[in-house]
Structures are given as C-alpha cells and as structure tokens.
Amino acid sequence: ILSVDDTMDSILNWYREEGMIFKGGSGAGLNLSRIRSSKELLKSGGTASGPVSFMRGADASAGTIKSGGATRRAAKMVVLDVDHPDIEEFIETKVAEEQKIRALRDAGFDMDLGGKDIISVQYQNANNSVRVSDEFMRAYEAGTEFGLKARSTGEVLETTDARKLFRKMAEAAWACADPGIQYDDTINDWHTNPETGRINASNPCSEYMSLDNSSCNLASLNLMKFLKSDGSFDAKTFGKAAEMIITAMDISICFADFPTQAITETTRAYRQLGIGYANLGALLMASGLAYDSEGGRALAGAITSLMSGITYKRSAELAAIVGPYDGFARNASAHSRVMRKHASASSSAKSVSTLDIDVWTE
C-alpha cells in the first residue's frame, strides 16, 4: 500500500514506486483523495488536474510493465473517498472506456484481454474502489444531500444526492465491475494499529488493508487438500498447517527485501502477515452445499474463525519468545479491542450442520 500527497513531486514518486513494485512481481494500491480535485485552484491561479487525470499516467505505466517479467500485467488498486469532488468522474471513468471497447470490437479491432488494440483504451490496469463513510450511508438512508469537500480547505464545494450517487456506483459496477466499495468506518473500527495511522487503502484485491507505505506477505491454503474421504473437513490438520505457514511467513520478514525505504521500515515495525484459503467454492460443491446457503456460510465462517484464532495464537506465542512487533506498545489497547471483536464474532456464530460443527469443536 502506497501513499501520495498533493504535490507534483509526490505524484511522480508514486509513478516511480509503482513501477519498481511491478518490476519485482508485486501489486500496489493507494488512495488518491489527498490530490486536489479538478474543481479547485492552483497557487498559480489555474485549475488543478484532479486525481483521475493522474490515474491515466499510472495506468499507462502499469499496462507497459510485465509483473516480475512474467506474462501477466501489473496489479493495481486505486481508491477515492466518497466525499471527493471528482467522485462522479471517478465512478464513470471505466464505464466510458467499456463503451469504447465494445464500439472498437464491433468495428473489427482486437479488443480481447491482451489483444494488440486493447492498449488504446485507458484505465484498464487497475481495480477502482470508492471509500464510503458511515456519514454517506446515513445520508443515503435518509435520502438527503451529501457534501463533497475541497482537499485544500475542507470546505464543502458542492452537494450531491446520496441516493443518486450510490445508484451511479451500482450501475457502473453492473456495467464494468467497478467501482468496488470499501466501508471506511468499519475497516478502521477493526484496525489494530490506529495510533500509528488510519487505513486509507488496500492492496489490489482488497484482502490486505493496513497502514500507508506498508506491505504484506500473503499465503493461501488449498481447502480441498483438507477434505477427507468420508466427506468431513480435517480441521486438525488444517490448523497445524496454518500454524506452520504463519510461523514461516513471520520469519521471512526478517530476510525479505522491500521496494522502498518507507515500506521496509513499516513492514519491519508492524510485521503484517496475510493468511487465507483458496478453493472454497470447490469445497462447498464437494460437500453438497450451495455457495449462497446457510450451510455454506456456516462452514466458511467456521474455517475462517479457526484459521484466525490459530494464527493469532501463534503470533502471541512468537511474541512471548522474541518480543512483540515494534509498533505494538502504542497500539496495545486498540489491538486488544480488535481481538475481543474477533472473539465476540466467533462466539455469536451459529452452527448449521455436522460439517461446520466439527470445525468449531476443533
């Protein structure tokens, strides 16, 4: 996760840092909301370009660089706060480009993913997400206006109908699968290090959310490997695997290289790790559970809870031996509060079948 400020030096440095990250085979996300909108003035008296225009340059760079020298292109996430004056332009950007793609395809151009003509279309190399606040959702529920604020002064430049704006997000997501929505207040309510800084953005796929200028080692366990011949889920072996993987990942931070000095310092100080699982859909199918069913959600919840509990337990055991991460002391109270939230969520979960009961009892 990177950061960018409202200066040309910072914007150009964003381009450079992303390029180095893509070269190394990783992806990056950042929040552009500090950049002045196209409705605000520059010191010189002109009008600012706005974040969407700067997205164009970053998008072109990402489309040019092969990630780690491989065949796939770079992975990007771009986030904009819902109260940014350019939010409507941000929401509609990809919709307009999708219309170009269809028109060019129908005219005979090669617009397949990776096709030779797709490079003429902009904004195709990033996932876009809107940071939605509780204040905005309250305005949506009440059917009232919502203020869009200047980045330089914080004053409300204009208001917009919250329901119409939310509708635009939904229609854009239907048309081109973007933007996604990130619920800012909820995300920061589960933040373990708020005394250090807030969470403003995520990695390209949004499974990692943490401090600006930070990174996270990611690992996934293949759930199908833990499906036993009798149809039950091997929770005990899964737990041991999660325990081993999280230990190895923590050790790897000590030996890893990072793309910038700021990311190196934050990652070494906070030691962010991300462990998850893959093949949930296959596991549910093999178990005879619909993806959108109470049984499916219960099994997924049980596995997630087990994985979270075991890995946090192992993290505490490691801290007892080598000491907590450097940033823990100033965030101890908040970290403990989030742990209690996890415990509360797990204790309030309900079992549906023997499949998830076996996992819960592990």
Residue spans of the language-model regions?
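Active-site cavity-forming subdomains of large catalytic enzyme subunits
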Residues: 1-241, 251-266, 300, 305, ...
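Short helix-capping/linker segments at secondary-structure and domain boundaries
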Residues: 224-230, 285-292
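Ferredoxin-type iron-sulfur electron-transfer modules in oxidoreductases and energy-metabolism complexes
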Residues: 295
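Short, contiguous, pocket-lining structural segments
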Residues: 237, 272-276, 307
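Short, flexible micro-motifs
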Residues: 28-32, 180, 279, 284, ...
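Core structural elements
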Residues: 246-252, 266-288
